[in-house]
């Protein structure tokens, strides 16, 4: 095996199910300290965060990643133990290998190689890691970003190691993400016997026109490379289970993935106004996961396009699809943000895996990006 492969396997073997870090950051900090980085451990709540820097001043380039992983699910469903990394037919298997311990290991190896070759590089190279990305994402990069605001810590560019590639390494460049807003709607009615509907108020019937209007609405036509804003109902619950009882309450959970045309407060206002027009007796609880971000054409995006094109053999698709990432907390600091990482076909699945050849190529990809930004 080689350095990035060994380090990835060491990380996989640490069962860092969110929000646990399981010693991953201590291992990585040891490597970065030995390479000349100044490391600051930020324990916030029950979450471990690591901020490592080399050099000083502007521009500041951050390599952003997470050491936590999602639960493996039933271990018996895996071909091998999810926390015992195994190579079979040129493929490395283990929980978190794609999302995103392989990228984190490649970050560290690339950073070590870069500072060894460029001790007096321009600006600051930084590595930011958290153990709270796959869970609630409250005490991780969200709080670290607030700390950076208090300190006046500027960030010019951010490369997140999320698994962005679709079929081959470097075939997709993530240049933004949609915002995410969740709502839980509770509509009150009056419970009663189905034979006496005049003595009850059915919350399902009362809410149906409002829900129909809500899901039929076209929020926008998209933005740049963003698909249109989408509202999806994810859960509906009402009733006792009996078919002769009109329910007294309806609960609906929904989520919006939205473009930069919107922000969370405006969406909340629009939806509240729609519900009010239908004169419902309701309560509505919101959860804001993050605002959208978008990196327009600029140095980071153009450099990444050239580097990924060289690695993949064709220009990358430039996309804003997918879920959310911690870059949503860094972008509001004024940073240009992109996401570059391995193939994402198996993330969060049983037998999560990455091609060994892709993993071995990642450090060179990241190092080339760093050199283009901090040396040229």
Swiss-Prot record:
Matches recorded under InterPro entries: Bact_exopeptidase_dim_dom (IPR036264), DapE_proteobac (IPR005941), Peptidase_M20 (IPR002933), Peptidase_M20_dimer (IPR011650), Peptidase_M20A (IPR050072)
Keyword Hydrolase tagged: yes
GO biological process: diaminopimelate biosynthetic process; L-arginine biosynthetic process; lysine biosynthetic process via diaminopimelate
Keyword entries, A-Z: Amino-acid biosynthesis, Cobalt, Diaminopimelate biosynthesis, Hydrolase, Lysine biosynthesis, Metal-binding, Zinc
Coiled coil: none
Keyword Repeat: no
Cross-referenced Pfam families: M20_dimer, Peptidase_M20
Positions that bind Zn(2+) 1: 66, 99, 162
Cofactor(s) needed by this chain: Zn(2+); Co(2+)
CDD domains in the record: M20_DapE_proteobac
EC number: 3.5.1.18
EC top class named in words: hydrolase
Annotated residues for binding of Zn(2+) 2: 99, 134, 348
GO MF annotations in UniProt: acetylornithine deacetylase activity; cobalt ion binding; succinyl-diaminopimelate desuccinylase activity; zinc ion binding
Lineage top rank: taxon: Bacteria
Family of this protein: Belongs to the peptidase M20A family. DapE subfamily.
Protein's job: Catalyzes the hydrolysis of N-succinyl-L,L-diaminopimelic acid (SDAP), forming succinate and LL-2,6-diaminopimelate (DAP), an intermediate involved in the bacterial biosynthesis of lysine and meso-diaminopimelic acid, an essential component of bacterial cell walls.
Known partners and oligomeric status: Homodimer.
HAMAP family for this protein: DapE
Official protein name in the record: Succinyl-diaminopimelate desuccinylase
Species this protein is from: Xanthomonas oryzae pv. oryzae (strain PXO99A)
Gene label: dapE
């Amino acid at each position: 095996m080689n350095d990035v492969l060994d380090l990835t396997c060491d990380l996989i073997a640490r069962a860092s199910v969110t929000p646990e870090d399981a010693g991953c950051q201590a291992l990585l900090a040891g490597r970065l300290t030995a390479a000349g980085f100044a490391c600051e451990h930020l324990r916030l709540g029950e979450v471990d965060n690591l901020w490592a820097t080399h050099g000083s001043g502007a521009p500041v380039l951050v390599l952003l990643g997470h050491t936590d992983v999602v639960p493996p699910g039933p271990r018996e469903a895996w071909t091998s133990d999810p926390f015992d990394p195994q190579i079979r037919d040129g493929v490395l298997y283990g929980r978190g290998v794609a999302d995103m311990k392989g990228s984190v290991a490649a970050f560290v190896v690339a950073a070590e190689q870069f500072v060894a070759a460029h001790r007096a590089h321009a600006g600051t190279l930084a590595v930011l890691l958290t153990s709270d990305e796959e869970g609630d994402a409250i005490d991780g990069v969200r709080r670290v970003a607030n700390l950076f605001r208090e300190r006046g810590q500027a960030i010019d560019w951010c490369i997140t190691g999320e698994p962005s590639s679709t079929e081959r390494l470097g075939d997709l460049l993530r240049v933004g993400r949609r915002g995410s807003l969740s709502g839980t709607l509770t509509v009150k009615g009056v419970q009663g016997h189905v034979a006496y509907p005049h003595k009850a108020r059915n919350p399902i019937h009362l809410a149906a026109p409002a829900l129909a209007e809500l899901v039929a609405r076209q929020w926008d036509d998209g933005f740049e490379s963003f698909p249109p804003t989408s509202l999806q109902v994810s859960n509906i619950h009402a009733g006792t289970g009996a078919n002769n009882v009109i329910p007294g309450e309806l609960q609906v959970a929904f989520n919006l993935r939205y473009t930069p045309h919107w922000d969370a407060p405006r969406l909340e206002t629009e939806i509240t106004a729609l519900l009010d027009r239908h004169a419902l007796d309701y309560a509505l609880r919101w959860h804001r996961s993050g605002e959208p971000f978008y990196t327009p054409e600029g140095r980071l995006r153009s450099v990444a396009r050239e580097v990924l094109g060289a690695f993949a053999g064709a220009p990358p698709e430039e996309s804003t699809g997918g879920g959310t990432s911690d870059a949503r907390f860094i972008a509001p600091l004024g940073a240009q943000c992109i996401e570059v990482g391995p193939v994402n076909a198996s993330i969060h699945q049983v037998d999560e895996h990455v091609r060994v050849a892709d993993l071995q190529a990642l450090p060179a990809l990241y190092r080339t990006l760093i050199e283009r930004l901090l040396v040229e």
